């Protein structure tokens, strides 16, 4: 028998490790951060943009639009960041609660939990004579057993303890960066009616770029994503501008 292979013709442990070292899969693993950035930037670009357009439609001066816009960006960043923190914290609390319950069940009803392991493995087409040794091996390793049940029975991944704060800051910063874009023209153009035109052009360009990047990272047709994102922003700003003009008249 050749070294590094077992009797069944499968690669041995050393050969398996060598194959794994040679094959590095290019999976994208920063999904949660990207999700937070998408949430923050999309809202940051759209909400202040609509607010600025609405105030411009009401004939407010650029200074008023800028002041109101910055106030909204600050409040929005705090609100969105807090929402991200609470969502991540709730997820972590739920994981801890389910982990404790699963630990208690493994101790109290081990046979039932072992049967659940067998049922899970059977769903993947593994036969009883094949999953039997796996079930027995897991019963001898409580932590591995617990991890298996959390992931495959409940579909829960252990959350990063830093996730809540990371989510809060990522969403808040992304919101600020996105929210300042539609306000930039009002910093340099004193007449709001002229500034709003520049704001529309600048923001739509930013929405197109952001939408393309979002589609690229989420593997969701970048050009289609760019057009959809820009369209949503355009509709929001047009609605706000039109409502302001209607109220004014």
Swiss-Prot record:
Activity control, per UniProt: Transport of iron ions is inhibited by zinc ions.
Location within or outside the cell: Vacuole membrane
GO cellular component: vacuolar membrane
Effect of residue 76 to A: Strongly reduces transport of iron ions
Record field: catalytic activity: Fe(2+)(in) = Fe(2+)(out)
Binding-site residues for Fe cation 2, renumbered to this chain: 102, 113, 116, 149
Cytoplasmic metal binding domain (MBD): annotated segments: 90-165
Mutagenesis or variant effect for residue 116 to Q: Strongly reduces transport of iron ions
Topology class, membrane: Multi-pass membrane protein
Disulphide linkage map: none
Transmembrane segments: 37-57, 64-84, 171-191, 195-215, 227-247
Mutation effect (residue 32 to A): Significantly reduces transport of iron ions
Effect on the protein upon substituting residue 105 to Q: Strongly reduces transport of iron ions
Residues annotated as binding Fe cation 1: 102, 105, 113, 116, 153
Main subcellular location of this protein, as a coarse class: membrane
Pfam families the UniProt entry points to: VIT1 (PF01988)
Stretches of the chain found on the membrane's Cytoplasmic side: 1-36, 85-170, 216-226
Function: Vacuolar iron transporter involved in the transfer of iron ions from the cytosol to the vacuole for intracellular iron storage. Can transport cobalt ions from the cytosol to the vacuole.
Family (UniProt): Belongs to the CCC1 family.
PANTHER family: FE(2+)/MN(2+) TRANSPORTER PCL1 (PTHR31851)
Free-text domain note: The cytoplasmic metal binding domain (MBD) is located between transmembrane 2 (TM2) and transmembrane 3 (TM3).
Name this polypeptide is given: Vacuolar iron transporter 1
Organism whose genome encodes this protein: Eucalyptus grandis
Taxon lineage: Eukaryota, Viridiplantae, Streptophyta, Embryophyta, Tracheophyta
